[in-house]
Swiss-Prot record:
One of the protein's GO biological processes: protein ubiquitination
Subcellular location: Membrane
Segments passing through the bilayer: 1-21, 61-81, 82-102, 105-125, 128-148, 149-169, 245-265, 294-314, 332-352, 356-376, 388-408
Organism domain of life: Eukaryota
Name recorded for this polypeptide: Sulfite exporter TauE/SafE family protein 6
One CC-aspect GO term: membrane
Signal peptide coordinates: none
Record key words, sorted: Membrane, Transmembrane, Transmembrane helix, Transport
Amino acid sequence: MKTLFVLFILILCVFAINANQQEEINQESTQQTHQNLLYKVQKWRTSLKDSSDAELKLSPALVVAGVLCFTAALISSASGIGDGFFFIPIMNLVAGIDLKAASSFSAFMVTGGSIANLINNHFGCKKLIDYDLALLLEPCMLLGVSVGVICNKVFPEWLITGLFVVFLMWSSMETCENGHTSWKLSLILREKEDMRDSRLAEVKRRRTIIFFKHLYLKIKKTETKQSFLGRNLGIISIKPCSVEYWILLSLQIPLALVFTILALSRTESLQEQSISNQEGTRLDHQFKRLMFPVMSFLAGLLGGIFGIGGGMIISPLLLRAGIPPQVTAATTSFMVFFSATMSGVQYLLLGMQNTEAAYVFSVICFFASTLGLVFAQKVVPHFRRASIIVFLVGTMMYLTTIVMASFGILVFYIDNDAGKDIGFQLPC
């Protein structure tokens, strides 16, 4: 009996030793895999440092990035959500271009899509664009973008990534909510159309197309200015971060204030007779008018920090302020065209590299956006399910959020483990 007991104890000891050895082997294997992953990511990040200065050559990765950008522009234009969120991740993760170079490429691609949007919106819906509101919002919005770009240089990368992920998650929720609203409205409109004659149904259908098109069309496309304070010299003689540069940058403050005050005065004088003489209504109207520059500055500030523009930010704020959805979307699209165009010109002035490739991507996104708009006008109303595309874009934004969050956490761990400075930095 004692012999069996001793033998049983020995067998348990052998199993315990084998289990411990196997656990150690698994831990070593997991640690080795983790180190290999970190090494590959670090090697990839190192290879991106000089990509903005190197000349881009035609490669499979660049072709895949072009196809993905074309698809993103087409789907986003068809849904009316916009595609500014997808360009930078595609160019950074697929084409292997660093974030600053990807931002400059995104500016040109947004410009191409904005041209298609302007042709479709401006010439077809002139009465929906509130030019006084655009003049009121644009100066403070551009000023906010300039301040946001400086914050982008000062803030650490992990903070910008975290803020961007939070904002992207909020935008995804807004997109899905808009898709749900579009779904319910399409059902209601479908029931009403069945009860009317064919002529009234056709009129209602066209109005519905215009409503959804201007409610969701490219309200977040605008300039991305992350390389505004770059080190390279452009075709201008003023060096970035020099005394002349800061003086020129500071001049935006009085100019923005002057144009905003003039726009406020003009708007008040034009609408003075249309406002009720009641004091409460007058004060409420003045409060909303004063809030518009503040909201546009906030939109430009966040847009400059994230490098994706402020269209997606200013549009919900205008809707909450009581501006009709059609006027909000059309006016924002009108503002975005000039902002995106100016952004591309500024990148050229600051010595942007690989301009030929940026032109090609801009043309690609122009045709993709045009096809997306045609699809939204001709195909989507036939099936009466525009909300499906909106849900699709919302899902894509959720996936982009997960990828950006995972990559940001991994990069933060690598930089912290390597002992790099992860705090705030000087703008120059």
